[in-house]
Curated annotation (Swiss-Prot):
It comes from Panagrellus redivivus. This is FMRFamide-like neuropeptide PF2. Myoactive. Signal peptide: none annotated. GO terms for biological process: neuropeptide signaling pathway. Nerve cords and paired groups of cells located caudally to the base of the pharynx. Disulfide bonds: none annotated. The modification Phenylalanine amide is found at residue 9.
Amino acid sequence: SADPNFLRF
């Protein structure tokens, strides 16, 4: 699952 937290970068 793609976590929005990882997309924060």
